[in-house]
């Protein structure tokens, strides 16, 4: 580049300008090239940058490095850089600006992207964090989107997630920040032992406290969701048991009920039938059933029978044993027990808001 002074922007025939950035293509060629423009245009703009013919801007980098560029190209790509060039007051055919704080090669990758909107895969892996910062400082939105996409697809890991999270907050990259936050929550034990976490603990203790608070909140929310799911599962099983009760006592199933099936080994459509049949047989022959607290299986059966009597629509016509007598017994129960039972009944009935059984009440009919 010794004879670079012999060239000027006016004397150089520049290749056609690149098209505006497009959405990331799923075409294999575009994926392999890591580019948003056609190969011919990319090559021409890369060649213009590499050969630096007619370059009229000197970019000073760390370690006294220099990068030659064309003001009309980088000024069109970044309003911030165009403003920096306008502030240059020296009367020479070359403008001079300084971009410090990042490795020289990372800055070359950045300037090259301003030319052709492309990058090498290895360069992105090595300098993604620097490129994210540069894209924010010099307002290059399409490069910021590329960096976010690369972090999301492959570059984000447990070792760098803390650093990337802090940069995402500083660089106004909310989606990337959300992805980092999710990774921190899902891998907190490993992330909290990383070097990035220790550095953040010293430099940004408030942010560390916020993360710890969010982790505690997420764990508590997860426990509540799990408890709620288990409750719904229990209420659903109780509702299915109530349906199976009516089926057994009205139609009969396998070896119990008013009629017996010809194929007792075959399963019916009610999953709870087998367990209920075993409980009914046990209740019929258990010698401890009349002794208070004598048999846990009998106690469970009595509770199921009472639950049925509370949700049954017509106890007079019901075939389930003791339905009407248990309904009469409700009148003598304490207020506390009655309220507890009503809450259970409503929760059980709420599991079938649509298409409930015609033999049972609706949840809306139960008042606490």
Swiss-Prot record:
Region: Disordered, residue numbers: 1-25
Tissue expression from the record: Preferentially expressed in young leaves, roots and stems.
Subcellular location as annotated: Cytoplasm
Keyword flag Iron-sulfur: no
TAZ-type zinc-finger residues: 233-324
Organism this protein belongs to: Arabidopsis thaliana (Mouse-ear cress)
Keywords: Cytoplasm, Metal-binding, Ubl conjugation pathway, Zinc, Zinc-finger
GO molecular function, one term: calmodulin binding
Record text on subunit structure and interactions: Interacts with CUL3A.
Conditions for induction: Up-regulated by auxin (IAA), salicylic acid (SA), hydrogen peroxide and cold.
Pathway annotation: Protein modification; protein ubiquitination
Residue span of region CaM-binding: 335-358
Protein name: BTB/POZ and TAZ domain-containing protein 5
One GO cellular component, as annotated: cytoplasm
GO BP, one annotated term: protein ubiquitination
InterPro entries for this protein: BT1/2/3/4/5, BTB/POZ_dom, SKP1/BTB/POZ_sf, TAZ_dom_sf, Znf_TAZ
CDD domains: BACK, BTB_POZ_BT
The record's note on its domains: The BTB/POZ domain mediates the interaction with some component of ubiquitin ligase complexes.
Main subcellular localisation: cytoplasm
Keyword Zinc tagged: yes
Biological role: May act as a substrate-specific adapter of an E3 ubiquitin-protein ligase complex (CUL3-RBX1-BTB) which mediates the ubiquitination and subsequent proteasomal degradation of target proteins.
Domain BTB: 55-123
């Amino acid at each position: 580049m010794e004879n670079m002074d012999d060239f000027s922007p006016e004397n150089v025939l520049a290749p056609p300008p690149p098209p505006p950035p497009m959405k990331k293509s799923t075409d294999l060629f575009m994926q392999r090239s890591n580019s948003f423009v056609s190969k011919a245009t990319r090559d021409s703009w890369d060649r213009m940058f590499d050969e630096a013919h007619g370059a009229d801007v000197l970019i000073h980098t760390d370690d006294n490095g220099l990068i030659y560029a064309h003001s009309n190209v980088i000024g069109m790509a970044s309003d911030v850089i165009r403003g920096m060039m306008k502030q240059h007051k020296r009367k020479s055919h070359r403008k001079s600006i300084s971009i410090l704080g990042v490795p020289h090669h990372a800055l070359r990758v950045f300037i090259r992207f301003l030319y052709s909107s492309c990058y090498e895969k290895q360069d992105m892996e090595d300098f993604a964090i620097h490129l994210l910062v540069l894209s924010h400082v010099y307002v290059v939105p399409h490069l910021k989107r590329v960096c976010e996409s690369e972090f999301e697809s492959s570059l984000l890991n447990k070792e760098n997630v803390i650093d990337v999270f802090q940069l995402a907050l500083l660089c106004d990259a909310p989606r990337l920040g959300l992805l980092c936050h999710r990774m921190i929550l899902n891998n907190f034990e490993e992330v909290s032992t990383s070097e990035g976490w220790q550095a953040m603990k010293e430099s940004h203790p408030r942010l560390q406290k916020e993360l710890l608070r969010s982790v505690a909140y997420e764990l508590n929310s997860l426990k509540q969701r799990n408890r709620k799911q288990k409750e719904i599962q229990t209420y659903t099983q109780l509702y299915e048991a109530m349906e199976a009760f009516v089926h057994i006592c009205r139609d009969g199933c396998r070896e119990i009920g008013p009629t017996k099936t010809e194929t007792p080994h075959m399963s019916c459509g009610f999953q709870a039938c087998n367990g209920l049949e075993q409980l009914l047989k046990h209740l019929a022959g258990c010698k401890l059933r009349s002794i208070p607290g004598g048999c846990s299986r009998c106690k469970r059966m009595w509770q199921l029978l009472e639950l049925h009597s509370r949700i049954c629509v017509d106890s007079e016509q019901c075939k389930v044993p003791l339905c009407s007598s248990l309904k009469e017994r409700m009148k003598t129960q304490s207020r506390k027990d009655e309220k507890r039972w009503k809450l259970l009944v409503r929760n059980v009935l709420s599991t079938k808001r649509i298409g409930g059984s015609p033999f049972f009440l609706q949840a809306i009919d139960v008042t606490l």
